[in-house]
A protein has these predicted regions:
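N-terminal Rossmann NAD(P)H-binding glycine-rich loop of SDR-like oxidoreductase domains
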Residues: 2-27, 32
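NAD(P)H-binding glycine-rich loop region in Rossmannoid oxidoreductase-like domains
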Residues: 36-38, 47-103
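Conserved Rossmann-fold NAD(P)-dependent oxidoreductase catalytic core, especially the SDR/UDP-sugar
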Residues: 81, 85, 90-156
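A conserved pocket-lining segment of Rossmann-fold NAD(P)-dependent short-chain dehydrogenase/reductase
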Residues: 90, 147-152, 195-222
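Flexible, glycine-rich beta-alpha linker
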Residues: 129-130, 178-199
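Active-site Tyr-X1-5-Lys
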Residues: 150-180
């Protein structure tokens, strides 16, 4: 029997690449989508990329709704939580980003703890580390946090910071801190798996090209 992984956000850019890597590594993947209308496209995309989609399942989950979270982890050994809101333009109300990011992380962690999931991986961001510090030439580590109250902290950075802090708090309270792994990448670049329009393509079409800066914390998606 293949180990089963619950992967939230499989229809996203990063989630799709994670799903492909898991399937190619022999795992059974239970991917979450907001509605099942996306399932056929995800299945076709991963199949075209060479994955064995006979081990691909789908479950409907909403970051702001409790429905389905408990059953989504049944028979799963691992959970990878990559679903989190990301928008082209920062909303006027920061809670439009913060609420689903934090609430979705809370639901994922609580479901994992209740089901005794062996290992939880959270996709956070360098944005949860780098903002609100005095001076520009500091060496930052996992011990450092972005300051949510700093005027230099964007809505997105605040949402990622608070969501990651929620994950650590819940796993610590459950006595499971050592079973949580968090990655904090910078901008993730790489090829699209399908012909959908990612954020960069939409900005380009809008006449706002976004060339990569000379110095930044980029990561290639295959890393």
């Amino acid at each position: 029997m293949f180990d089963r992984v619950l992967l939230t956000g499989i229809s996203g850019f990063l989630g799709g690449h994670i799903g492909l890597a898991l399937l190619n590594a022999g795992y059974t993947v239970r991917g979450s989508v907001r509605n099942l209308s996306k399932a056929d496209k995800v299945r076709a995309t991963l199949s075209a990329a060479g994955a064995d989609v006979s081990r691909l399942e789908f479950v409907v989950l909403d970051l702001l709704d409790d429905t389905g979270w408990g059953s989504s982890v049944v028979d799963c050994r691992y959970l990878i939580h990559s679903a989190s809101p990301f928008v082209l333009r920062a909303p006027a109300d920061e809670m439009a980003l913060i609420r689903p990011a934090v609430a979705g992380t809370r639901r994922a962690i609580m479901a994992a703890v209740a089901a005794h999931i062996e290992r939880v991986v959270l996709t956070s961001s360098i944005a949860a580390i780098q903002y609100g510090h005095a001076g520009d030439e500091q060496v930052l580590s996992e011990a450092d946090w972005t300051s949510p109250s700093s005027p230099n902290t964007s809505h997105y950075a605040r949402s990622k910071t608070l969501a990651e802090q929620e994950a650590w708090a819940l796993m610590t309270a459950a006595g499971r801190r050592g079973d949580l792994a968090v990655i904090n990448p910078g901008v993730i670049l790489g090829p699209l798996l399908d012909n959908g329009l990612g954020t960069s393509a939409l900005l380009e079409m809008a006449g706002e090209p976004t060339p990569a800066p000379l110095v930044h914390a980029h990561r290639y998606v295959f890393d």
